C-alpha cells in the first residue's frame, strides 16, 4: 500500500469512527442513509478543487460544483487550517442527514472521509446561495413573490428543525449565504455545523457565541444562553435583508459600518416606511389594485420581521411555527 493510500486509509478509519459515534448519538440514532465517496471521486468531480469550480467561499470552507456519476452536485470542502472545526464538520453531516427529508433543506447525498476533514456531497442548486444582501451572484433581481417564497420556505425548514426531533435543535447561523436556491426558486437551508440541541425539559443551553455579525441575537451575545429565540432573531434579520436588499451590516452615509436592524429602527421612528423597502419590489406591478395588495403584503412582512427581532419587546412571536403560519397568510394576501 502506498504512503498516500495509507494516509487516506488512516483518515477514513478515524473519521468514520467519529462520524458513526455522532450519528448514533444524534436524534435517537435515527438517520437518513448517506453514501460514502472516495477522495478520487471528489478530486475528479472538482478538477482537483479547481478555482473554476468554486460556487462560494468562506473562511471555514469552500463550496464547489462537481459531477459524480453523471449527476451535478455541490461539494463542501473544509479548510485544513481550521481543525478547530472538527466537531462542527461531523455535526454538519449528522444534522444534514436528518434534515434532508425536508424539501426546504439542502439534501445531503453523502460524504468523503478520506480527507483530514470530511467533505460533504449535496444536491446541486442552479442559483447557488444568496449573497449577503439577499440577492444572487448572477445579478438577477429577485421579484417580490420569490423573496416572500424564500422567507416562507426557510421558516418552514427552521420550524422543522425546532420541532421534529426529540430535542429542540437550534441552527445558530441563519443568514442569506446559508440559503441555496434551486432552478424552481425553491429555498434550501444549509450549513448545520453550529447546531446545538436543547435537552428535553430544559429551556436553554449555555455555549460560546456563534454566528455572523448582524444576525446574532443580542440576548444570546450577552448571556451565552441558546434558545429558539436565537434563530427567530436571525431569521427576522434575513427577512429585513430580503425586504431592503441591504446586507445585515452595510456602509452608512458616512461610509461607517451600520447595522441594518439599527437602520430600520431609525427609519421606523421617523415613520418613513418606503425608505426601508428595496425599490425593485415595486417593479412588476400590473396596476393600482396590485400596488394596494403589494403594500399590504410588504407592510405585514415588515411587521413580522420587526416582531422577530423584538423591535417592540412587548410583542414578540411565540416561536418559528407562528412565523411560518404568518408568512403563509401574508402570501395569500396577493
Curated annotation (Swiss-Prot):
Q: State what changing residue 231 to N does.
A: In zed1-4; loss of function, impaired interaction with RPP13L4/ZAR1 and Pseudomonas syringae type III effector HopZ1a, and completely abrogated hypersensitive response (HR)
Quote a single Gene Ontology cellular component term.
cytosol
Site: Required for Pseudomonas syringae type III effector HopZ1a recognition and interaction with ZAR1. Where? 231
Tell me which residues make up the Protein kinase domain: 49-334
Gene Ontology terms: biological process: cell surface receptor signaling pathway; defense response to Gram-negative bacterium; regulation of growth; regulation of immune response; response to temperature stimulus
User: After gene disruption, what is the outcome?
Assistant: Reduced resistance to Pseudomonas syringae expressing HopZ1a. The double mutant zed1-6 zrk12-1 exhibits short inflorescence stem and autoimmunity symptoms when grown at 25 degrees Celsius.
Keywords in alphabetical order, please: Acetylation, ATP-binding, Cell membrane, Cytoplasm, Membrane, Nucleotide-binding, Nucleus, Plant defense
Q: In which tissues is it expressed?
A: Expressed in seedlings, young leaves, floral organs, shoot apical meristems (SAM) and inflorescence stems.
Inducing or repressing factors:
Induced by the elevation of ambient temperature both in the nucleus and the cytosol.
Where is this protein localized, as stated in its record? Cytoplasm, Cytosol; Nucleus; Cell membrane
**Binding annotation for ATP:** 55-63, 76
- Per the record, the coiled-coil ranges are none
| PROSITE patterns, alphabetized | PROTEIN_KINASE_DOM
Q: Which residues carry this modification: O-acetylthreonine?
A: 125, 177
What job does the chain carry out? Together with RPP13L4/ZAR1, involved in the ambient temperature (above 22 degrees Celsius)-sensitive aerial organ development. Together with RPP13L4/ZAR1, involved in the regulation of the ambient temperature-sensitive intersection of growth and immune response in the absence of pathogens, by repressing the transcription of SNC1. Probable non-functional kinase required for recognition of the Pseudomonas syringae type III effector HopZ1a by RPP13L4/ZAR1 and, together with SZE1 and SZE2, to trigger subsequent defense responses.
**Which family does the record assign?**
Belongs to the protein kinase superfamily. Ser/Thr protein kinase family. ZRK subfamily.
The molecule here is called: Non-functional pseudokinase ZED1
Amino acid at each position: 500500500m502506498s504512503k498516500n493510500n495509507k494516509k487516506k486509509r488512516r483518515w477514513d478509519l478515524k473519521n468514520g469512527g467519529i462520524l458513526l459515534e455522532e450519528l448514533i448519538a444524534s436524534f435517537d440514532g435515527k438517520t437518513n442513509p448517506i453514501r460514502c465517496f472516495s477522495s478520487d471521486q471528489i478530486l475528479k468531480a472538482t478538477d482537483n478543487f479547481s478555482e473554476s469550480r468554486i460556487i462560494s467561499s468562506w473562511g471555514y470552507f469552500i463550496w464547489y460544483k462537481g459531477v459524480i456519476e453523471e449527476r451535478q452536485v455541490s461539494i463542501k470542502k473544509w479548510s485544513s487550517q481550521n481543525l478547530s472545526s472538527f466537531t462542527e464538520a461531523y455535526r454538519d453531516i449528522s444534522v444534514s442527514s436528518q434534515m434532508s427529508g425536508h424539501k426546504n433543506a439542502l439534501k445531503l447525498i453523502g460524504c468523503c472521509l478520506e480527507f483530514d476533514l470530511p467533505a460533504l456531497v449535496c444536491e446541486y442548486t442552479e442559483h447557488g446561495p444568496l449573497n449577503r444582501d439577499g440577492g444572487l451572484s448572477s445579478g438577477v433581481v429577485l421579484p417580490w413573490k420569490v423573496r416572500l417564497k424564500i422567507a416562507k420556505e426557510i421558516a418552514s425548514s427552521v420550524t422543522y428543525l425546532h420541532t421534529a426531533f426529540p430535542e429542540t435543535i437550534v441552527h445558530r447561523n441563519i443568514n442569506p449565504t446559508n440559503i441555496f436556491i434551486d432552478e424552481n426558486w425553491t429555498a434550501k437551508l444549509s450549513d448545520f455545523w453550529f447546531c446545538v440541541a436543547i435537552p428535553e425539559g430544559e429551556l436553554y443551553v449555555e455555549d460560546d457565541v456563534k454566528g455572523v455579525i448582524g444576525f446574532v441575537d443580542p440576548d444570546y451575545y450577552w448571556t451565552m444562553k441558546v434558545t429558539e429565540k436565537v434563530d427567530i432573531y436571525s431569521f427576522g434579520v434575513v427577512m429585513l435583508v430580503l425586504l431592503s436588499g441591504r446586507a445585515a451590516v452595510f456602509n452608512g452615509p458616512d461610509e461607517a459600518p451600520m447595522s441594518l436592524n439599527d437602520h430600520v429602527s431609525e427609519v421606523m421612528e421617523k415613520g418613513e416606511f418606503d425608505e426601508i423597502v428595496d425599490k425593485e419590489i415595486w417593479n412588476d406591478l400590473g396596476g393600482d389594485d396590485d400596488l394596494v395588495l403589494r403594500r399590504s403584503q410588504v407592510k405585514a412582512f415588515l411587521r413580522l420581521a420587526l416582531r422577530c427581532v423584538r423591535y417592540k419587546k412587548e410583542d414578540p412571536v411565540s416561536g418559528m411555527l407562528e412565523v411560518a403560519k404568518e408568512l403563509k397568510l401574508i402570501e395569500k394576501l396577493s
